[in-house]
Amino acid sequence: SNTNLTHIIGYLRTVSEDFLKDAPEELKYHRDDIYGATGIESYYEHLLRGKNGFEYHLVDNRGIDHGILLDENRTSPQKGETLLLTIDHDLQVLVEKLLTNYKGTIVCSNPKTGEIHAIASSPDYDLSSFVGPIPMDLWQNWNTDENRPLFNRAINGLYPPGSTLKL
């Protein structure tokens, strides 16, 4: 059985000129870099990002690359941190299945440790749609859908307190 973890992982976006105006200087974003826009990708962007590398290439007037120029000025990219989540796969599959065809959210946590074992928001969206450019009609559909599939009800929803199950 599969889970999509849509609202947990979140999605990535491409850095725009507007984003650069407000971006933290210490992360050194450049136009067309990729950044975490929502979910864990956004919250832990500062850890996951890593650092860009660069190297100078000698390219002639015909566009032919003749290799690296000034190897001592080369900087290798640095990988970002690895995160370990406390999500229980089987429980996550179950909560996503329970929410199928419903609008709502389920959060399963350990009250003693604060660990989140499952968290889902419905409706959601196909996370693979964010690989490559998103067709404008799909983006508009998501943003005009009255069920708000991009909205993470578990994190961003404001609800009055209700009864809780006490064990």
Task: List each model region and its residues.
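Residue-level preference for non-acidic, small/hydrophobic
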Residues: 8, 95, 114, 164-167
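Extracytoplasmic/periplasmic proteins that interact with beta-lactams or build/remodel peptidoglycan
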Residues: 1-105, 120-153, 158
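Ser/Thr-centric signal marking residues that sit
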Residues: 82, 86, 113, 164
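Short, glycine-anchored, charge-dense loop/turn motifs used at functional sites
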Residues: 110-117
